[in-house]
Amino acid sequence: MGYIPYVIENTDRGERSYDIYSRLLKDRIVLLSGEINDSVASSIVAQLLFLEAEDPEKDIGLYINSPGGVITSGLSIYDTMNFIRPDVSTICIGQAASMGAFLLSCGAKGKRFSLPHSRIMIHQPLGGAQGQASDIEIISNEILRLKGLMNSILAQNSGQSLEQIAKDTDRDFYMSAKEAKEYGLIDKVLEKNVK
């Protein structure tokens, strides 16, 4: 991430300068942007845990603009979303593809949103292997296990059958925000922030 904007806030004690992400965190907004890897996941998990410690009853907003990424990194975010007490609402801004779409669907029921011109894409896990045949078999079995796990969670989150999810994730399956709502990955397409 290149340039990070700063905002200045006037308080009783004078002016205070924040980077924009710290300011958003004050409002319980976490931004998941770009490829999901271990570093990004650790940052998201830390922010979720921090916000739970600040107020375990108040919702957290997870804004997603991501092409996806590493499955285990994404699953660490998913597990933390389920582990913490506050509801995590998810909002797609731009795109939620692959693991990004998976996490979008994992928001609290009734609190999964997308902006109108965002795109959502689901597909099966990607992976590669090299080495001895037995090593390739081990990796292949693990990818198939993760595929089954993610399809099962997507089916539960969307209300689609496991068979339908398996069919749709066999290749890249793109949806508009409206189509993602009809599919069950989100609950509402947001036109205006009513805060």
Swiss-Prot record:
PROSITE patterns: CLP_PROTEASE_HIS, CLP_PROTEASE_SER
Enzyme class, broadest EC rank: hydrolase
GO molecular function terms listed in the Swiss-Prot or TrEMBL record: ATP-dependent peptidase activity; ATPase binding; serine-type endopeptidase activity
Pfam families on file: CLP_protease
Predominant place of localization: cytoplasm
Alphabetical UniProt keywords: Cytoplasm, Hydrolase, Protease, Serine protease
Catalytic reactions of this protein: Hydrolysis of proteins to small peptides in the presence of ATP and magnesium. alpha-casein is the usual test substrate. In the absence of ATP, only oligopeptides shorter than five residues are hydrolyzed (such as succinyl-Leu-Tyr-|-NHMec, and Leu-Tyr-Leu-|-Tyr-Trp, in which cleavage of the -Tyr-|-Leu- and -Tyr-|-Trp bonds also occurs)
GO cellular component: cytoplasm; endopeptidase Clp complex
Positions annotated as active site in the UniProt record: S98, H123
Enzyme Commission number(s) of this protein: 3.4.21.92
Quaternary structure annotation from Swiss-Prot or TrEMBL: Fourteen ClpP subunits assemble into 2 heptameric rings which stack back to back to give a disk-like structure with a central cavity, resembling the structure of eukaryotic proteasomes.
Role noted for this protein: Cleaves peptides in various proteins in a process that requires ATP hydrolysis. Has a chymotrypsin-like activity. Plays a major role in the degradation of misfolded proteins.
Similarity remark: Belongs to the peptidase S14 family.
HAMAP family reported for this sequence: ClpP
The protein's name in its UniProt record: ATP-dependent Clp protease proteolytic subunit
Source organism (scientific name): Helicobacter pylori (strain Shi470)
Source taxonomy: Bacteria, Pseudomonadati, Campylobacterota, Epsilonproteobacteria, Campylobacterales
Gene from which this protein is expressed: clpP
